[in-house]
């Protein structure tokens, strides 16, 4: 399919991304390699997946409400955060190139970022600060940037994980929150504008991980430089 899309529309014109796991056995036969997370380095650079490792490292366990991530108090995640910055593509061991990785912390399934943070942070002002930190972290990682619509104004599903069968009142975008959380929304806008000025983060080619250098870490803190030349 990837090859035919390239022939018909041109290389890089049509993106192919998916969830990197199978719910059950598949009908794949012979030596064909299924497009699962563990096989991503064997796939074409234009075939990519949602990166749950980055998501969970930043905000915490996707299924366990009380298990936090880096931003809400978990220890020992510094190396995972640095791997996330490079879209897990260092030396091509896990991922060929950042083009294969969707960098995100919330999507249509599971808790929204705001609801997940509420599980461990009761004070709203602190939650806003931590939300900003989470956004700043994944928006300064390599890969294809993605965020849930409304995340920028603290989208909530009233704490429910999956709302595919819930009424529209729960799934709709509450635009009143866009005004209530103007500061958070403006912060997201600033991060997006900043990212566009940093080619080292937007580079999705093989070897782009080399643009991240002199990284360091200590307990609860990570740092790195980005090569933005070219």
PLM segments and residue spans:
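Conserved alpha/beta catalytic core and glycan-binding cleft of carbohydrate-active enzymes
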Residues: 2, 13-149, 153-154, 199-202, ...
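Alpha-helical structural signal in soluble globular domains
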Residues: 3-8
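Alpha-helix initiation and N-capping motif
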Residues: 78, 98, 110, 166, ...
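Catalytic cores of secreted or luminal carbohydrate-active enzymes
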Residues: 174-206
């Amino acid at each position: 399919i990837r090859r035919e899309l390239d022939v018909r529309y041109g290389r890089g014109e049509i993106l192919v991304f998916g969830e990197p796991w199978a719910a059950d056995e598949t009908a794949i036969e012979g030596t064909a390699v299924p497009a699962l997370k563990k096989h991503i380095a064997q796939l074409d650079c234009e075939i990519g997946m949602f990166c749950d490792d980055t998501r969970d490292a930043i905000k915490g366990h996707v299924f366990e409400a009380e298990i936090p991530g880096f931003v809400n108090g978990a220890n020992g995640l510094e190396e995972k955060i640095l791997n996330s910055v490079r879209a897990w593509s260092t030396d091509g061991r896990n991922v060929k190139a950042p083009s294969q990785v969707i960098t995100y912390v919330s999507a249509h399934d599971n808790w929204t970022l705001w609801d997940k943070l509420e599980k461990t942070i009761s004070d709203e002002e602190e939650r806003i600060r931590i939300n900003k930190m989470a956004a700043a972290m994944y928006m300064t990682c390599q890969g294809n940037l993605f965020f849930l619509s409304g995340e920028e104004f603290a989208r909530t599903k009233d704490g429910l994980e999956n709302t595919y069968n819930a009424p529209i009142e729960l799934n709709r975008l509450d635009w009143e929150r866009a005004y209530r959380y103007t500061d958070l929304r403006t912060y997201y806008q600033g991060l997006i504008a900043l990212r566009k000025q940093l080619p080292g983060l937007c580079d999705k080619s093989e070897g782009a991980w080399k643009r991240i250098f002199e990284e360091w870490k200590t307990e609860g803190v990570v740092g790195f430089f980005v090569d933005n030349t070219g």
